[in-house]
Amino acid sequence: KIKVADPGLFMVGVVSNDETKIPVYDAAKKRIIVNNLNDGGDKEYVGIVKTGDEFYVKLPEKIDKVIILTGVIKTEFTSMANQKSYYELGKGTITYHPFSVAKRSKVQFDITSIGKKHEKVGVYIEKNVNGTWKKVGYSTTVKPDKYDSTVLYGLEAGKYRLALKTPKDQIINVEYTRDKSKKKAAYKKSKAIHLKSDIDSIYTSTEKAARWYKVSVSSTKKRKAVTLSKDSVGGGFKFCVYQKGKRLKTVKVTKNDKVKTVKLPKKKGAYYVKVTKLTSKTTGAYYLGTYTY
């Protein structure tokens, strides 16, 4: 018998020496809540519980050793700390979750649904500007299923809050990660950063100036290509490739996880990549890489 002491998301799991079936029943011992705890999974989420709820774990008659693990996870949270995980039980209304950014950073939220309900969740960011909350970048919706739905922003120092609109009775897990991102950018072609390996950088909502990168082709026997991609909420980036002042190619990247490739001419020389935001509200990361083929 398991009796719940605190309200929240109830979790139960087992560690066993064999593969004997171990089900979980309701308080009346009639309805099976979890068919088998001992099927190789680390844990099972039974659902939202309140103080005093009861469950029964049915063990086999012959048993060597079984360890039963139980816990209740809070389904409400307010402020967030870096590299921490939180759970929320949706109310169908917007909830706000404050966090601080000390230095220019790449900020990421991985959102996963727990349980059977996997409806869309509304997401956006606000910044505290002189005591007033103002939206940063674009709003979006994610539909978290088995896998994480990632939302990424490029943010300058300040006080922020994550706004979530989770459907009523839907349980979500939110993992918050913040990584400092030093501002390494060249704003003139003559000072372009030499692209020798893969790089990534961010644009915050207030950063608008174009940035320059240089790619050198030293052999005509093999060709070189530049890969371009991004991770942002809405908006996107434009990449223009130049040689000797002439624009060779323009590529717009508006979808995440969509890598585009520009094959450079089979000709020695220096090529330049100019990066700009497609919209003033774009905030997030862009990625540049090169390879020889």
Predicted regions, residues:
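Non-catalytic extracellular/lumenal accessory regions of secreted precursors
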Residues: 1-7, 17, 37-40, 68-106, ...
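Beta-strand-connecting loops/turns
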Residues: 7-8, 52, 92, 104, ...
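A short beta-strand element within beta-rich, extracytoplasmic domains
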Residues: 9-16, 106-114, 222-231
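Short, surface-exposed beta-strand/strand-loop-strand elements in extracellular ectodomains
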Residues: 19-30, 119-131, 235-247
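Edge beta-strands of jelly-roll/beta-sandwich modules across compartments, strongly enriched
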Residues: 20, 58-73, 97, 119-121, ...
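Solvent-exposed serine/threonine-rich low-complexity stretches and specific carbohydrate-binding patches
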Residues: 31-40, 122, 135-145, 248-256
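Exposed aromatic-hydrophobic patches
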Residues: 43-48, 97-98, 147-153, 258-265
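Noncatalytic modules at the cell exterior or secretory-pathway interfaces
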Residues: 47-62, 152-167, 222, 263-278
